[in-house]
Design a protein with these regions (language model features):
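Alpha-helical transmembrane bundles and membrane-interface segments of multipass inner-membrane proteins
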Residues: 1-199
């Protein structure tokens, strides 16, 4: 903490950038899903051999095809997350720019998957990482995952709030070290006085 400088962005910047980033994630997500559904079950394209394939999967669960059978519950949860992010962006007194971008990506991805669940009853997944045993995912999932990472990095390393906490901890550590030095000096003086009295 305390590394780098990132002043708290004004509310207009927060809302403008957050809205723009969320919209980009949402549009890319929905357009790619539209293209995948247009091809349908016949879709199976090797993008990078042994690494990435494209194939159409109907996901009735959460992100990365997990939690199947609870689609509506996840849609409600996604809407709650979106509302929480919006409130935080408006009310937080101190934010890093990267926090805003990250949370906007999360919101855009959450909206994208929520639209699928509410309109079709499933989420369109199509990106398969064939080099590992991993669930099929989509652009919204990428936005959510990358957004969480960026928001955490922004909060822990760049936000003014984090720097204030770091500065307070540093001051407390200095005060504690100073108090220990003074206690040691008092102990040394007391020992010398005792030695003189014993003589």
């Amino acid at each position: 903490m305390g590394r780098g400088a990132d002043m708290t962005p004004p509310l207009r910047w927060r809302l403008g950038v957050a809205g723009g980033v969320a919209l980009v994630v949402l549009l890319v997500d929905q357009l790619t899903k539209l293209a995948v559904r247009a091809v349908g079950d016949a879709l199976h394209v090797t993008v990078i051999p042994g690494v990435i394939d494209f194939l159409f999967v109907r996901n009735i669960g959460a992100a990365f095809s997990m939690g199947e059978g609870h689609g509506i519950a996840f849609a409600v949860l996604a809407l709650a997350v979106i509302i929480a992010i919006a409130v935080y962006l408006v009310r937080a007194p101190q934010l890093a720019h990267l926090e805003v971008v990250g949370m906007a990506m999360v919101a855009g991805g959450a909206v994208g998957n929520a639209i699928d669940r509410l309109t079709m009853g499933f989420v369109t997944d199509f990106i398969a990482a064939t080099f590992i045993d991993f669930p099929v995912f989509n652009v919204a999932d990428i936005g959510i995952t990358v957004g969480v990472v960026l928001a955490l990095i922004g909060y822990m390393f760049l936000s003014p709030a984090a720097r204030e906490v770091d500065a307070t901890a540093e001051l407390n550590a200095r005060d504690e070290a100073r108090a220990k030095r003074k206690a040691k000096q008092r102990g040394e003086r007391a020992r010398k006085i005792r030695e003189r009295n014993e003589r």
